[in-house]
UniProtKB/Swiss-Prot annotation:
Keyword flag Magnesium: no
Gene Ontology biological-process entries: protein refolding
Cell location: Cytoplasm
UniProt function note: Together with its co-chaperonin GroES, plays an essential role in assisting protein folding. The GroEL-GroES system forms a nano-cage that allows encapsulation of the non-native substrate proteins and provides a physical environment optimized to promote and accelerate protein folding.
NCBIfam families, A to Z: GroEL (TIGR02348), PRK00013.1 (NF000592), PRK12849.1 (NF009487), PRK12850.1 (NF009488), PRK12851.1 (NF009489), PRK14104.1 (NF010704)
Pfam families recorded: Cpn60_TCP1
SUPFAM superfamilies: GroEL apical domain-like (SSF52029), GroEL equatorial domain-like (SSF48592), GroEL-intermediate domain like (SSF54849)
Protein name: Chaperonin GroEL 2
PANTHER family: 60 KDA HEAT SHOCK PROTEIN, MITOCHONDRIAL
Cellular component, GO annotation: cytoplasm
Gene3D superfamilies listed in its UniProt record: GroEL, GroEL-like equatorial domain, TCP-1-like chaperonin intermediate domain
Family: Belongs to the chaperonin (HSP60) family.
Keyword Iron-sulfur assigned: no
Length: 546
């Protein structure tokens, strides 16, 4: 085990504070509509330009072990806020820095760190209660667009795209952000359920121009096993032929005699049929087939459930208004499933999302949820250069998470105003002793930091702006740093999602109070470089003849 370097008390906190300041100062220049860009060096390719707080925070690694510990703790604040609300990372970092600075001063002055922490916790509780009380539900499409615009740094085009996407796929729908191949940013919406499996044989194609299978008012057979024998399928095919409706088969695979018969029947026009492979693998495949069954009002045919294919009748098949299959994807639109069944399945998937600890599983569950609940929207971000596209994509990502958060918990006045107003409520918080009171005071001072920083980034005097905002009683009154005017923030469309503001203060206070209560730090001592090998003896060059 290598030797360790141990620091105590004031020295430990000072080194840690230096790291906090380096990271926070790099991140906070991005705050607000007039925030600046940060250029990140990449080991290969062009440098990356971003205005996203968490992206900057993740790049920072310091040489000094103790400073680095402080920086990494604050980086945790930014990434936790990004995970929970998808935005508000810079606000959280600014708040954490302000609380740590004031807290470190109080500890150095001899106050009890644990009482300071209790005071901070009491203050945060009161702030969150005030934010929730003043939160306003998002009702209109315009408000969603405003939230998106603010998060995308005042880019109203991005706000409008997000509002359109949410309108089309619903609040539960999946919105993905990709890089476009063109200069323009565009929105592409897939309604209904789409999965990434195409037709098994091109002979099933009905629209030769687009190389696509299109079927209206189709029956859907959902089978878990491979289909190779024709005998087990025959009774069902005869029943479907009599209805005159098309049939789509979703199975692990269709091969041999079964595939040949289906293709021949399709070409002779006796039966409109198409077959696709089942999506996913293993347990996820079973779950997705069950989703398709619930969406279409059919049954997943599985021998585990004791259902044999030869015993299947028409009532066990799913139905859909339209099914489209191309080489790579299958889309089922307007399935005939009962609304109550679909809602129950959605609730079940939501519960699984809450419980899962794996990011990959969560992402896959959210995809399944979207396919059941609404659809998938893809925003393709365009730009003149690769650097511009990446920077824009960062902003669209932020804005997408912010609009989701706004729909979930409502909105508050932006520009740091909601936190400023909440600081006024802390005067009435009751504490048990003076040290706890100081803890509350630390948070009260810190709550003005985001509004002050936004003003500083816009070239104004932060303290003057904060003073003027607090002079007015009106809750939504604040400073629009884009235009330089004092306005009603909500009616001007400068709004923040409640969830973003709430998680920012909770995460900042949580990590900051840990830093304040730190009394010792342990880091590995840098290893001394081993001495190099001795030089060979001087003289002639070895192995040479003269």
């Amino acid at each position: 085990m290598s030797a360790k370097d141990v620091k105590f008390g004031v020295e430990a906190r000072d080194r840690m504070l230096r790291g906090v300041d380096i990271l926070a100062n790099a991140v906070k220049v991005t705050l607000g509509p007039k925030g600046r860009n940060v250029v990140l060096d990449k080991s290969f390719g062009a440098p990356r330009i971003t205005k996203d707080g968490v992206t900057v925070a993740k790049e920072i690694e310091l040489d000094d072990k103790f400073e680095n510990m402080g920086a990494q703790m604050v980086r945790e604040v930014a990434s936790k806020s990004a995970d929970a609300a998808g935005d508000g990372t810079t606000t959280a970092t600014v708040l954490a820095q302000a609380i740590v600075r004031e807290g470190a001063k109080a500890v150095a002055a001899g106050m009890n760190p644990m009482d300071l922490k209790r005071g901070i916790d009491l203050a945060v509780e009161a702030v969150v209660a005030d934010l929730v009380k003043n939160s306003k539900k998002v009702t209109s499409n315009d408000e969603i667009a405003q939230v998106g615009t603010i998060s995308a740094n005042g880019d109203s085009e991005i706000g409008k795209f997000l509002a359109d996407a949410m309108k089309k796929v619903g609040n539960e729908g999946v919105i993905t952000v990709e890089e476009a191949k063109s200069l323009e940013t565009e929105l592409d919406v897939v309604e209904g359920m789409q999965f990434d499996r195409g037709y098994i044989s091109p002979y099933f194609v009905t629209n030769a121009d687009k190389m696509r299978v299109e079927m209206d008012d189709a029956y859907i057979l959902i089978n878990e096993k491979k289909l190779s024998s024709l005998n087990e399928l025959l009774p069902l095919l005869e029943a479907v032929v009599q209805t005159g409706k098309p049939l789509v088969i979703v199975a692990e695979d269709v091969e041999g005699e079964a595939l040949a018969t289906l293709v021949v029947n399709r070409l002779r026009g006796g039966l409109k049929v198409a077959a696709v492979k089942a999506p996913g693998f293993g347990d996820r495949r079973k779950a997705m087939l069950q989703d398709i069954a619930i969406l279409t009002g059919g049954q997943a045919i599985s021998e585990d459930l004791g259902i044999k294919l030869e015993n299947v009748n028409l009532s066990m098949l799913g139905r859909a208004k339209k099914v489209m299959i191309d080489k790579e994807n299958t889309t089922i639109v307007n399935g005939a499933g009962k609304k109550a069944d679909i809602e129950a399945r959605v609730a079940q998937i939501k519960a699984q999302i809450e419980e899962t600890t794996s990011d990959y599983d969560r992402e896959k569950l959210q995809e399944r949820l979207a396919k059941l609940a609404g659809g998938v929207a893809v925003i393709r971000v365009g730009g003149a250069t690769e650097v511009e596209v990446k920077e824009r994509k960062d902003r669209v990502d932020d804005a997408m998470h912010a609009t989701r958060a706004a729909v979930e918990e409502g909105i508050l006045p932006g520009g740091g105003v909601a936190l400023l107003r909440a600081s006024e409520q802390l005067k009435g918080v009751r504490t048990k002793n003076e040290d706890q009171k100081t803890g509350v005071e630390i948070v009260r001072k810190a709550l003005s930091a985001p509004a002050r920083q936004i003003a500083i980034n816009a070239g104004e005097d932060g303290s003057v702006i904060v003073g003027k905002i607090l002079e007015k009683e009106q809750y939504a009154y604040g400073f629009d740093s884009q235009s330089g005017d004092y306005v009603n923030m909500v009616s001007k469309g400068i709004i923040d999602p409640t969830k973003v503001v709430r998680t920012a203060i909770q995460n900042a206070a949580s990590v900051a109070s840990l830093l304040i209560t730190t009394e010792a730090m342990v880091a590995e001592l840098p290893k001394k470089a081993a001495a190099g090998p001795a030089m060979p003896p001087g003289g002639g060059m070895g192995g040479m003849d003269f």
